[in-house]
C-alpha cells in the first residue's frame, strides 16, 4: 500500500513539475496578498474568554466609568511651589486631550481634614487620648522648668497621625497629590479607553508626551522639564517627570515585545542560513531550502489571515520559531534524496525511495508535532489556542511544501540545468564500508545504565519544578514604568491597583460595604473605599464625639505658643477636627461623592465600590487569592462581580495554570494514539518515545537545578517539546526498521537529525536576543528540551535499540 502511494505521488511530481510549480506560485501569491492585510491585535482583553463574569463586568464598567485604568505623571523636584504651578498648568492642558476623561493633580480635602477624627478607629482614638494626656503632663513639666526627655510620645502621636493622614486614598494635609516627603506630585489621568487596547494606549501616551513637550518649550514657570525617572529630586529649577500606570506598563511591555521580535527573527534567519551553508556547502541547495521555507511561512500567514483574521501578542512571535522547526523536513528530504541519488544515479527512483521512507517519517513527525499543538486550540486563552492553530497548521504546510516544491524544483532544475544533479552526488564510500562491517553500537549497556540513573535523578528534580507567579518574569523586566509604579506604591501607600464593583442602589452599596468590611473573610483586601467610607455609621460617630469632647477638655491645657513647625500644623488640624460635629452623606461635598458615581452619559444612577488589595500587582499568587475572594461577592443571594486589571490578570493566570496542566497531557495521549495507528505495534512506542520522555525529564530537571521556573509565557513550549521529541525519535527509528542495524540508522540519519535539531535550536535561541524576559524564558526552555531530546536520540535510544536487539526482546516489526 505504501509503495503504491509513494509511486503515485512520485509519478505526479515527475510528470507535472511545471503545473505543480505554477499552482504553488499562485497559492504563494494569494497568500502574500492575504498576509499583507494581516494585522496584530494588541487588545489583550480579547484573548481572555469573553463569557467570564469579570470580562462582562469590565465591558459594563467601561460604559459606566467611560473607561478604566489610570495614567500617572510623576513630577519630581525640590521647588514645591513651582512644582504645584507646573502641575496645575499641565493638568489644564492634558484635560484638552480627546482621549482624556479627567485629569487631576489636587482635590479639595478640607472636608476630610476637618472631620479627620471621625475616620479614626475608636481604639486608635482612645490611644490618641492617652498619648495626649501624657504629652500634656510632659509639657507642663517643661513649663515649670523641669527637664523632660519624653520623645517617644511625640513619635507615637506622629505615627498615629501618619496612619490617618490618608483618608480614602487622599492625603488630608495638602490638597495636591504630593507624597509625605514633598518630592513628588502626581497628575492622575483617567482616559476614555482600556489599557489592554494598546492602540488606544499608544495614542494617549503620545498625546500626553506632546503636551508636556509643548509646555516645556513655552516654559511659562521657568521650569526645565525633562523625562527621567530616578532616585531623589532634581536640582535647581529642573523638574523631572515619568509616566506609569496601567496604560504605560501595558503599552511598554507590548511595544518592547514587538521590537524584540524583529532582531530575534533576523537572528533566526541568519543563524539558520549560516548553519545550512556549513551543512550542505552547495549554494543552490541552500537557496532551494530557504526559498521553500519562506514560501511556506507566507502560506502559513495567509492561512492565518483567512482563518483568524489577525495575529495577537503571542502569535506574533511565530515567524522565527516556524523557521527553525520547519526547515527540519527540508533537511531530512535533502539528506535522504542525496543518499539515494548518490547510490542509484536515477532521479525518479531516488525521489520515490525518499518519499517512501523519509516521507513516511516526515508524515508521522508532522502529524504528531502538529497534533501536540492543535490540542491548544481547545484552550480558553486565545493566545494559546491561536498559537496552536497557526503553529500546527504551519508545520503541516511546511512539511507538504518540502515534499512538493523541493522535488518539483529539483526536477525543473535538472531539466534546464543538467549539471545541477552533479551537486547532489556525495561520496559515501566511508559510510558504505562501515555499513558492510555492520558493527554494533558500542557500550550500549553502560550508556543505558548510566542514562537510566541520570534520568531517575533528574526525574526527582523535575517533579519539584515550580510555577513562577511573579508576572515580571514574563514581561520585559524592570522597566522605568514598573520601577516608578513601585516607588509610587511605597510613597503614597498604594499597595495595588484597585478593583471595582458596581451596585445599582444605595442600599446595595451599603450591604456590599458591610460585607467587604469583614477582614477575616476578606484577608487579601487592604482597604475598601466606598461612598459609605466617607460617612462612618452614626452610632460610631456618636461614640467618637464622646471621646472628642474629653480630648477637647484636655486640649486647652496645651500651651499653643509652645507649638512650632510640624507640631503646630498637626495641632491646628487636630483642633479643627475636634470641633467638627457628626455628619451624614448629605453633608459630604459633591466633589468627593462623584468619584463613586457613573459618568452622566452612561445613564446609570448606581455606585462604585473600590477594593484595594494587599501586596504587589506583580505577585500573581496574591492576585489569584485576592480574585478568589472578591471576584464574585454574594450578598443576600445576589452576585456582584469585581473588575479591574488585577482581576483580569488573575483570571488569565488561573486559565494558564489550568491549561498548562491539561494540554501537555492531552498532547501526550494524542501522540500515543497517532503512533499506535502508524506502527500498529505497541513495542514501537518504547523506542519512538524515548527522546520525548527523556527530553522532557531532562529539561524539567535541569530547569530546577538552574533555578528556573515555568511561567505564563514559556508554558506554551511544553507541547512544542513534546512534538519535537517524538519527531526526532521517529526518523531514527524508521531508518532502523529498514535495516535493523543501529549504526546504519545513525550513519544515514543521525546527521540529518542533528542538523534539524540545531536549526530548531537556532530558531528558539534567537529569542535570547529579544531582551524580553518572557521570550528569553521560552527560548531557554525550548533549547533545554530539544537539546535533551537530541542527546537522548543519539545516545540512549541507540543503546536501547542495540540492547534489545542483542537480548532479542521488544523487537518491533520491520515495517512501520
Regions found by a protein language model. Give the residues of each.
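Alpha-helical transmembrane helix bundles of large polytopic membrane transport and channel proteins
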Residues: 23, 85-185, 204, 224-230, ...
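Solvent-exposed, non-transmembrane loop/terminal regulatory segments of multi-pass membrane proteins
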Residues: 35-78, 163-176, 437, 443, ...
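Pore- and gate-forming transmembrane helices of large, multi-pass membrane proteins
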Residues: 261, 290, 342-379, 689, ...
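Transmembrane alpha-helices and their membrane-interface boundaries in multi-pass membrane transporters
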Residues: 306, 323-335, 359-378, 383-426, ...
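Juxtamembrane segments of multi-pass membrane proteins
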Residues: 436, 443-563
Amino acid at each position: 500500500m505504501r509503495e503504491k502511494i509513494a509511486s503515485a505521488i512520485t509519478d505526479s511530481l515527475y510528470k507535472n513539475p511545471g503545473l505543480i510549480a505554477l499552482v504553488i506560485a499562485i497559492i504563494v501569491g494569494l497568500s502574500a496578498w492575504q498576509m499583507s492585510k494581516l494585522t496584530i491585535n494588541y487588545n489583550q482583553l480579547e484573548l481572555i474568554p469573553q463569557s467570564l463574569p469579570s470580562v462582562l463586568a469590565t465591558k459594563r464598567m467601561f460604559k459606566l466609568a467611560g473607561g478604566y485604568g489610570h495614567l500617572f505623571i510623576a513630577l519630581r523636584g525640590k521647588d514645591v511651589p513651582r512644582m504645584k504651578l507646573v502641575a496645575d498648568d499641565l493638568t489644564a492642558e492634558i484635560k484638552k486631550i480627546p482621549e482624556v476623561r479627567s485629569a487631576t493633580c489636587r482635590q479639595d480635602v478640607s472636608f476630610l481634614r476637618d472631620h479627620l477624627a471621625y475616620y479614626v478607629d475608636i481604639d486608635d482614638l482612645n490611644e490618641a487620648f492617652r498619648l495626649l494626656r501624657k504629652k500634656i503632663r510632659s509639657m507642663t513639666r517643661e513649663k515649670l522648668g523641669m527637664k523632660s526627655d519624653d520623645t517617644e510620645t511625640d513619635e507615637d502621636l506622629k505615627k498615629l497621625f501618619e496612619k490617618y493622614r490618608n483618608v480614602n486614598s487622599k492625603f488630608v494635609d495638602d490638597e495636591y497629590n504630593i507624597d509625605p516627603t514633598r518630592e513628588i506630585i502626581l497628575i492622575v489621568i483617567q482616559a476614555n479607553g482600556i489599557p489592554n487596547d494598546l492602540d488606544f494606549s499608544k495614542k494617549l501616551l503620545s498625546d500626553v508626551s506632546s503636551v508636556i513637550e509643548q509646555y516645556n518649550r513655552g516654559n511659562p514657570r521657568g521650569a526645565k522639564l525633562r523625562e527621567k525617572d530616578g532616585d531623589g529630586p532634581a536640582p535647581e529649577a529642573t523638574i523631572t517627570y515619568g509616566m506609569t500606570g496601567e496604560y504605560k506598563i501595558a503599552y511598554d511591555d507590548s511595544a518592547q515585545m514587538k521590537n524584540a521580535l524583529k532582531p530575534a527573527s533576523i537572528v533566526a534567519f541568519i543563524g539558520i542560513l549560516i548553519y545550512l551553508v556549513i551543512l550542505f556547502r552547495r549554494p543552490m541547495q541552500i537557496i532551494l531550502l530557504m526559498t521553500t521555507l519562506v514560501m511556506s511561512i507566507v502560506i502559513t500567514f495567509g492561512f492565518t489571515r483567512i482563518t483568524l483574521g489577525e495575529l495577537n501578542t503571542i502569535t506574533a512571535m511565530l515567524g522565527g520559531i516556524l523557521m527553525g522547526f520547519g526547515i527540519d523536513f527540508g533537511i531530512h528530504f535533502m539528506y535522504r534524496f542525496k543518499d539515494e541519488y548518490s547510490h542509484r544515479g536515477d532521479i525518479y527512483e531516488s525521489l520515490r525511495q525518499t518519499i517512501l521512507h523519509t516521507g513516511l517519517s516526515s508524515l508521522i513527525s508532522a502529524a504528531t508535532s502538529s497534533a501536540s499543538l492543535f490540542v491548544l486550540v481547545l484552550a480558553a486563552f486565545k493566545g494559546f489556542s491561536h498559537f496552536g492553530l497557526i503553529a500546527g497548521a504551519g508545520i503541516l504546510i511546511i512539511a507538504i511544501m518540502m515534499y512538493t516544491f523541493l522535488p518539483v524544483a529539483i526536477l525543473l532544475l535538472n531539466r534546464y540545468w543538467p549539471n545541477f544533479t552533479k551537486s547532489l552526488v556525495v561520496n559515501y564510500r566511508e559510510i558504505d564500508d562501515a555499513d558492510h562491517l555492520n558493527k554494533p553500537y558500542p557500550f550500549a549497556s553502560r550508556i543505558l545504565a548510566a542514562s537510566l540513573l541520570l534520568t531517575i535523578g533528574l526525574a526527582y528534580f523535575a517533579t519539584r519544578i515550580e510555577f513562577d507567579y511573579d508576572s515580571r518574569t514574563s514581561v520585559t523586566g524592570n522597566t522605568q514604568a514598573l520601577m516608578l509604579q513601585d516607588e509610587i506604591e511605597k510613597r503614597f501607600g498604594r499597595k495595588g491597583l484597585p478593583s471595582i464593583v458596581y451596585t445599582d442602589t444605595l442600599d446595595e452599596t451599603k450591604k456590599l460595604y458591610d460585607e467587604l468590611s469583614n477582614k477575616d473573610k476578606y484577608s487579601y483586601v487592604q482597604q475598601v473605599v466606598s461612598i459609605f467610607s466617607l460617612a462612618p455609621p452614626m452610632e460610631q460617630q456618636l461614640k467618637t464625639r464622646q471621646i472628642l469632647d474629653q480630648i477637647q477638655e484636655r486640649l486647652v491645657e496645651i500651651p499653643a505658643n509652645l507649638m512650632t513647625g510640624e507640631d503646630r500644623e498637626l495641632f491646628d488640624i487636630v483642633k479643627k477636627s475636634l470641633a467638627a460635629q457628626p455628619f451624614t452623606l448629605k453633608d459630604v461635598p459633591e466633589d468627593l461623592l462623584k468619584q463613586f458615581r457613573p459618568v452622566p452619559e452612561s445613564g446609570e444612577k448606581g455606585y462604585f465600590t473600590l477594593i484595594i488589595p494587599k501586596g504587589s500587582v506583580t505577585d500573581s499568587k496574591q492576585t489569584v487569592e485576592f480574585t478568589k475572594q472578591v471576584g464574585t461577592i454574594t450578598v443576600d443571594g445576589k452576585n456582584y462581580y469585581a473588575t479591574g486589571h488585577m482581576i483580569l490578570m488573575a483570571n488569565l493566570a488561573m486559565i494558564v495554570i489550568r491549561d498548562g496542566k491539561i494540554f501537555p497531557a492531552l498532547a501526550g495521549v494524542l501522540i500515543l494514539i497517532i503512533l499506535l495507528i502508524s506502527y500498529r505495534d505497541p513495542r514501537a512506542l518504547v523506542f519512538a518515545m524515548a527522546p520525548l520522555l527523556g527530553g522532557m525529564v531532562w529539561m524539567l530537571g535541569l530547569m530546577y537545578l538552574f533555578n528556573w521556573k515555568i511561567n505564563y509565557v514559556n508554558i506554551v513550549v511544553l507541547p512544542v517539546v513534546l512534538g519535537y521529541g517524538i519527531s526526532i525519535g521517529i526518523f531514527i527509528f524508521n531508518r532502523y526498521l529498514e535495516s535493523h542495524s543501529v549504526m546504519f540508522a545513525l550513519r544515514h540519519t543521525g546527521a540529518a537529525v542533528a542538523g534539524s535539531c540545531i536549526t530548531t535550536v537556532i530558531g528558539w535561541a534567537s529569542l535570547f536576543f529579544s531582551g524580553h524576559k518572557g521570550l528569553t524564558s521560552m527560548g531557554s526552555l525550548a533549547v533545554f528540551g530539544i537539546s535533551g531530546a537530541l542527546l537522548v536520540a543519539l545516545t540512549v535510544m541507540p543503546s536501547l535499540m542495540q540492547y534489545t536487539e542483542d537480548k532479542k526482546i521488544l523487537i518491533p516489526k520491520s515495517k512501520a
